[in-house]
C-alpha cells in the first residue's frame, strides 16, 4: 500500500501519541504509595503486553486480538492522562477517553479505524472473554508492580 504524504504525516502523529505514553507517570503510585519515580503508562502497557501474550497462549485465547486490545487499552491516556478514580467519575473518564481515542484513531488509515474502535469499545464494555482477560491483566500487572515497589521499600 502506498501512502500519500498526508497519510504519512498522520501516522507520524499517531506514533508520537503512542510515544507520549512514555512520559505519563502512573498516578496511583504517586498519590497512594508516594513512589518517587513510578512506572510510566508505557512501562505498564509493555508489561501487560508480555503477560497477555504468554498467558493468552497458555489458556488458548485469541492472542492476536488480545494483544491489539492490550496495546489499545490505555492509549487515550496520552491525551487525558492517567486519571485517578477519586479525581474523576467513571462516566466522565469513559467520555473523555472515548473522545480522545476517536481523535487518536482518526490518524490511522481508514481500514484500521473501525477495527480498532471496535476493539477499544469491546474493552470498555468488558463483556467478552477477551475483554475480561485484559481487565484481569491490568490487575495482575498492578499487583506485580506493587510487589516490586514493596521490595524497593514503598508501602
Regions found by a protein language model. Give the residues of each.
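Active-site helical microenvironments for divalent-metal-assisted chemistry
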Residues: 1-155
Amino acid at each position: 500500500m502506498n501512502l500519500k504524504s498526508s497519510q504519512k504525516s498522520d501516522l507520524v502523529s499517531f506514533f508520537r501519541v503512542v510515544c507520549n505514553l512514555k512520559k505519563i507517570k502512573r498516578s496511583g503510585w504517586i498519590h497512594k504509595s508516594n513512589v518517587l519515580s513510578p512506572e510510566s503508562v508505557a512501562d505498564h502497557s509493555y508489561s501487560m503486553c508480555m503477560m497477555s501474550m504468554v498467558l493468552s497462549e497458555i489458556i488458548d485465547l485469541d492472542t492476536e486480538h488480545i494483544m491489539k486490545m492490550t496495546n489499545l487499552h490505555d492509549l487515550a491516556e496520552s491525551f487525558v492522562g492517567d486519571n485517578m478514580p477519586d479525581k474523576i467519575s467513571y462516566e466522565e473518564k469513559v467520555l473523555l477517553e472515548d473522545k480522545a481515542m476517536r481523535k487518536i484513531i482518526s490518524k490511522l488509515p481508514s481500514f484500521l479505524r473501525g477495527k480498532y474502535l471496535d476493539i477499544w469499545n469491546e474493552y470498555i464494555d468488558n463483556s467478552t472473554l477477551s475483554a475480561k482477560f485484559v481487565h484481569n491483566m491490568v490487575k495482575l500487572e498492578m499487583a506485580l508492580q506493587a510487589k516490586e515497589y514493596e521490595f524497593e521499600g514503598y508501602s
